[in-house]
Each structure stands twice: as C-alpha cells, then as structure tokens.
Regions:
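Metal-dependent nuclease catalytic cores that hydrolyze phosphodiester bonds in DNA/RNA
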Residues: 1-121
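Nucleic-acid nuclease catalytic cores
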Residues: 59-60, 75-103, 107-194
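Short amphipathic alpha-helical segments
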Residues: 61-69, 178, 243, 247
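Extended, charge-rich alpha-helical segments
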Residues: 95-97, 242-319
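Short, charged, low-complexity amphipathic alpha-helix
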Residues: 138, 173-242, 297, 318-319
Length: 319
C-alpha cells in the first residue's frame, strides 16, 4: 500500500489534517465542476485569505445522516457496511501527502474474502434536489473517483437521500484514466497555486469582486465589437423590462381599484361556498420599527458609538 491511514483524536484535529491537502470534496472545484465554489475561491480559502468554511446546519445534518444513508444502502443492496469506517479518519497518499480523502463509509465487496483490497467506498449524500442516477452531479462523481484512487480500491457507490423522502444509489467502478487526469490538475493546483502562490484566473463576477473590490480611479478598458454590442443589447433589454414593469403596475393598480375594501377577488360565477380566488389584498400584521432618525437626534453620542463603516461596493451602471 502506498498510503497511510490517520485516525485523529477528535473532529478538530481531523479538520486540521484536511486543511493540509486537497480533499475529495475540493477536486470538483479544481476541475471547475463545482457549482458552489470556484478554483479562485478555494485558493483564497487554502491560502488563509478567507475564513475556513463554517459548518452550517445542512452540513451538520448531512454528517449526522450518513448513518441513515448507509443503512438504506445496506438494505437495498445487502452489502455489509464496515462499522469501523464510521467517524472522522483520513487516507493520505505517501508520495504526495496533499492527496488525502475521508470516506463516509466503506463496505465489504460480496463474494470476496474480507481484506483491505476487497472493500468499496460509500459516499453518502443528503440533498434537496432531484437526482438522476444516470446523470450524477459531476462534482459527486469526481469526489468518489478521487477517493477510490487515493485508497487504491476498485469499487464504490454514491447513495443519496432526497428531502428525507426518496433514496437512490449508483454503484461505480474506478476509472483510472479519469483519476490520472484529476491528479494532473490537482498537482498543478497544489504546486503552482498553493505552493507557488499563483492566483487562479477569475471565472465569474464573484471572483472579480474578490480580486478587485474597488475600482482604479481613471482606469478604462476599451470595448471590442462584441462587448459594445452586448452593451447595446443590455440597454434594449433594460428598456423592455422597464416598459413591462410600468404595465405590471398599471394592471395591478386596476385590480386594487376594483377590490376597494374587499379582501379577495374571485372568478366570475364562483360559488360563495367555495370561490375561486384570483387575487387578495390584505393588510400585513403590525410591526415594530426602530426610529433611527429620532434616536440619532436625541442621543447623538450614544448613536455615534454604534456606527461603523461599510466599504462601498462596486455599482454597475449602463451609460
């Protein structure tokens, strides 16, 4: 075996170990296949420029529900989940220590002797989206293939629980050609971007704002024909939207005029017992608001003590 298994004493230590390399959940990001994070954002986090991800409720729930997902998989397939695989542990490549994975669960491959080589990896997911087993999210596929490669295993599966109501899974074989491609990209990212400090390119507007939160006064960029056409097209779209918004307000006001003091507008011919509601116009519940203007006037020193500066954000205007 060309890897080492690490079993940290607690979750905090496990998180520290994860920060010292590239985990399986980060590979899809490096390949540009993660819809929730870009390579530049990952780079900033790894370099300590941005705070580490804070475990939110969804992440914590997913961690707690790994047991449930693994049990569903066991019941559906009859495969034996290895109890010792639960918990926080890591597999680290001995040659490239930045290649490190933390499988959710492992299982014994049916029909084979129980040994380190005859295990499969189970990646457990909880999600709010509908999942097509024949077209898995790309970053999920990357995650499992990376785990199989680092762990030197042949088989794995992704199992998911959708909104707590639907369960699905897909068994997958290790794809060495794809794994080799991933490792080339991970090597490049680690050596050039993390160790070498080279910033990845910005691939969306969020990246641009992270790189350039303030504009350079007086600096201009000359548009090419395509960009000039884009500005003209955007101007037309804004004018169309403005006209639609005006029309929307006119129609809405006409309906409100018809309602008067009524609560609801019903369809023509609706029965009193079960009317078909077309629209309602109801008062919201009373709310309490803070009179900031009066407080500032009557308690200026106290008010000043609670003021803070918010950096100005870049505002896009079409001329």
């Amino acid at each position: 075996m060309s890897y080492t298994i690490i079993r940290p004493k607690d979750r905090r230590e496990w998180l520290r170990h994860r920060e010292n390399g590239i985990g399986s959940s980060e590979v899809g990001t490096i390949l540009g296949l993660n819809p929730y994070e870009t390579p530049y954002q990952l780079w900033r986090r790894k370099k300590g420029l941005d705070a580490p991800k804070v475990e939110n409720f969804a992440m914590r729930a997913g961690h707690y529900l790994e047991d449930a997902v693994s049990l569903f998989y066991r019941d559906e397939t009859g495969k034996e989940i290895i109890k010792a695989s639960a918990g926080d542990w890591l597999i680290v490549n001995n040659e490239k220590e930045y290649l490190r994975v933390s499988p959710d669960r492992t299982y014994w491959i049916p029909g084979r002797p129980k040994s380190d080589r005859n295990k499969g990896i189970l990646e457990c997911k909880t999600t709010q989206m509908e999942v097509d087993g024949d077209s898995l999210p790309q970053h999920w596929f990357c995650q499992l293939q990376y785990q199989l490669g680092v762990a030197e295993l042949e088989q794995g599966a992704i199992a998911w629980l959708t909104m707590g109501r639907e369960f699905g899974y897909r068994d997958l074989a290790f794809d060495k050609e794809f794994y080799d491609y991933m490792i080339e990209e991970v090597d490049r990212f680690w050596i050039d971007n993390i160790v070498g400090g080279i910033e990845p390119l910005a691939i969306n507007v969020d990246d641009v704002l992270l790189k350039n939160p303030r504009h350079i006064i007086g600096k201009t960029v000359e548009a090419d024909e395509e960009l000039a056409q884009s500005c003209a097209e955007l101007k037309e779209i804004k004018e169309e939207l403005s006209a639609l918004d005006t029309r929307k307000k006119d129609i809405e006001n006409a309906i409100k005029m018809a309602l008067g003091d009524a609560e609801a507008l019903v369809a023509p011919g609706s029965s009193l017992a079960k009317p078909t509601i077309l629209a309602t116009w109801k008062a919201a519940k009373d709310s309490t608001k803070f009179d900031e203007k009066r407080f500032a006037a009557e308690k200026p020193e106290l008010y000043a003590g609670y003021q803070y500066t918010v950096p100005g954000s870049r505002r896009f205007l079409l001329k």
